[in-house]
């Protein structure tokens, strides 16, 4: 019975439509004995299904091994390819939109806001009906409300009625435009002033270079107190003269805050002088251009009041035609008989006998701001010192007089 049952099961398995590989394991018992049907082990590997009638599943107590043996290749096991994923095939051109459908950018709130502002700018009085705006822009009215709520929150529009709004940005723009025009005018004025200053600086630089490089101007490279008075009036403005070595740094603060002048130099000392107001016979024998002379001097009086110490050859050329008349010899002494014309004369003699005749020459034109020296230099000269020792000046830089 067992053998008949096993044969029947084997026949049922082999009678199927799909091919199977049947493996039968033999028992270790003697050939005379037979095992029951339950001890018979059958292993079958299913093959891929083919179209046709569904085969009958063998009634076995153990499920078939899910393994495929391809005997046509050298390899014993080959992985089975996965079947195609089930589902609807992707229709080509599904993302394409119809010609009448709008894109996402065309329906964006940003573009709608720009178009709404264009409608506001085209309105003569700045009033726009929201219903009319929704029809013109071809958008829903709620999107127009989203725009108006934001614009009203930043105070660019105001509600005139339920569906009418008015633009307020023109008033703000008018105030800003007027201020912008004022700022532009101020900027143009500042640029014109800056160009004028640049031209003046360039002109002064060129003139100063030509003046200093010209050899014929070397003998006149100095400034007198009268030159400064011809520019400004010391009674109204304070004139200060700074004598400093080369590479001196001069810094001037803003006059609007606190006017300060800072002068620094590492090459030598810095001297600052104050140009005083003009007073009769104090600064210089040369008359100030701000005060008319009291009386015209005759040629005879000019001979008497002429300074015995001449500063330049120009003064000599001016005085010689007046002094040397026909039949007149060159005077060798001043009207004061005791005063000598020698440049090596003692300063004491000049102070004692000539101070009445030369009041302007003895007085300093500039007032030194530094404190005076405690020692009296008028009576402290040594035997080897001369008149040049009385002045803090290098007389070697002056041009020699040509008589």
Swiss-Prot record:
Highest taxon of source: Eukaryota
Region (Transactivation): 335-403
Chain ranges for the short sequence motif DEF box as given in the UniProt record: 135-171
Gene Ontology process terms (BP): positive regulation of transcription by RNA polymerase II; regulation of transcription by RNA polymerase II
Keyword list, A-Z: Activator, Cell cycle, DNA-binding, Nucleus, Transcription, Transcription regulation
Statement: the UniProt record of this protein carries the keyword Nucleus: yes
GO cellular component terms given for this protein: nucleus; Rb-E2F complex
Location (main, coarse): nucleus
Start and end residues of each stretch annotated as Retinoblastoma protein RB1 binding: 375-392
The entry's DNA-binding region: 87-171
Region Disordered, annotated ranges: 45-64
Region (Dimerization): 172-261
Molecular function terms, GO-annotated: DNA-binding transcription activator activity; DNA-binding transcription factor activity, RNA polymerase II-specific; protein dimerization activity; RNA polymerase II cis-regulatory region sequence-specific DNA binding
Keyword Nucleus: yes
Region listing for Leucine-zipper, in residue ranges: 130-151
Pfam families from the UniProt entry: E2F_CC-MB, E2F_TDP
UniProt-annotated location(s): Nucleus
InterPro entries reported in the protein's UniProt record: E2F (IPR015633), E2F-DP_heterodim (IPR037241), E2F_CC-MB (IPR032198), E2F_WHTH_DNA-bd_dom (IPR003316), WH-like_DNA-bd_sf (IPR036388), WH_DNA-bd_sf (IPR036390)
Paired cysteines (S-S): none
UniProt-annotated stretches for the region Cyclin A/CDK2 binding: 44-85
Subunit structure: Component of the DRTF1/E2F transcription factor complex. Forms heterodimers with DP family members. The E2F1 complex binds specifically hypophosphorylated RB1, the interaction represses E2F1-driven transcription. During the cell cycle, RB1 becomes phosphorylated in mid-to-late G1 phase, detaches from the DRTF1/E2F complex, rendering E2F transcriptionally active. Viral oncoproteins, notably E1A, T-antigen and HPV E7, are capable of sequestering RB1, thus releasing the active complex.
Function recorded in the entry: Transcription activator that binds DNA cooperatively with DP proteins through the E2 recognition site, 5'-TTTC[CG]CGC-3' found in the promoter region of a number of genes whose products are involved in cell cycle regulation or in DNA replication. The DRTF1/E2F complex functions in the control of cell-cycle progression from G1 to S phase. E2F1 binds preferentially RB1 in a cell-cycle dependent manner. It can mediate both cell proliferation and TP53/p53-dependent apoptosis. Blocks adipocyte differentiation by binding to specific promoters repressing CEBPA binding to its target gene promoters.
Record family assignment: Belongs to the E2F/DP family.
Descriptive protein name: Transcription factor E2F1
Name of the coding gene: E2F1
């Amino acid at each position: 019975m067992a053998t008949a049952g096993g044969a029947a099961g084997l026949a049922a398995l082999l009678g199927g439509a799909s091919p199977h590989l049947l493996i039968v394991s033999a028992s270790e018992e003697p050939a005379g004995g037979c095992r029951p049907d339950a001890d018979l082990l059958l292993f079958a590997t299913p093959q891929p299904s083919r179209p046709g009638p569904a085969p009958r599943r063998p009634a076995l107590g153990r499920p078939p091994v899910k393994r495929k043996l391809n005997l046509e290749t050298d390899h014993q096991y080959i992985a089975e390819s996965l079947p195609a994923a089930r589902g609807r095939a992707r229709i080509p051109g599904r993302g394409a939109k119809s010609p009448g459908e709008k894109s996402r950018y065309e329906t964006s709130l940003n573009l709608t806001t720009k178009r709404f502002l264009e409608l506001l700018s085209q309105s003569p009085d700045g009033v726009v009906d929201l219903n009319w705006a929704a029809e013109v822009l071809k958008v829903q009215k709620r999107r127009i409300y989203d725009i108006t709520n934001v614009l009203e929150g930043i105070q660019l529009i105001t509600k005139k009625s339920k569906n009418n709004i008015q633009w307020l940005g023109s008033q703000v723009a008018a105030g800003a435009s007027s201020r912008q025009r004022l700022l532009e005018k101020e900027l143009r004025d500042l640029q014109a002033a800056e160009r004028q200053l640049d031209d003046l600086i360039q002109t002064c630089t060129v003139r100063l270079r030509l003046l200093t490089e010209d050899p014929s101007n070397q003998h006149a490279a100095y400034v007198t107190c009268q030159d400064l008075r011809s520019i400004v009036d010391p009674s109204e403005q304070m004139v200060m003269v700074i004598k400093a070595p080369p590479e001196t740094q001069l810094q001037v603060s803003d006059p609007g805050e606190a006017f300060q002048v800072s002068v620094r130099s590492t090459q030598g000392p810095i001297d600052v002088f104050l140009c005083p107001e003009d007073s009769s016979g104090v600064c210089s024998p040369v008359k100030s251009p701000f005060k008319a002379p009291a009386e015209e001097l005759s040629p005879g009086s000019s001979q008497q009041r002429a300074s015995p110490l001449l500063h330049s050859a120009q003064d000599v050329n001016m005085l010689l035609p007046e002094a040397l008349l026909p039949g007149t010899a060159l005077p060798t002494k001043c009207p004061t008989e005791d005063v000598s014309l020698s440049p090596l004369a003692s300063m004491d003699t000049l102070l004692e006998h000539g101070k009445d005749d030369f009041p302007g020459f003895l007085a300093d034109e500039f007032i030194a701001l530094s404190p005076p020296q405690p020692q009296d230099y008028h009576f402290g000269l040594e035997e080897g010192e001369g008149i040049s020792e009385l002045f803090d000046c290098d007389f070697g830089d002056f041009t020699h007089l040509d008589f």
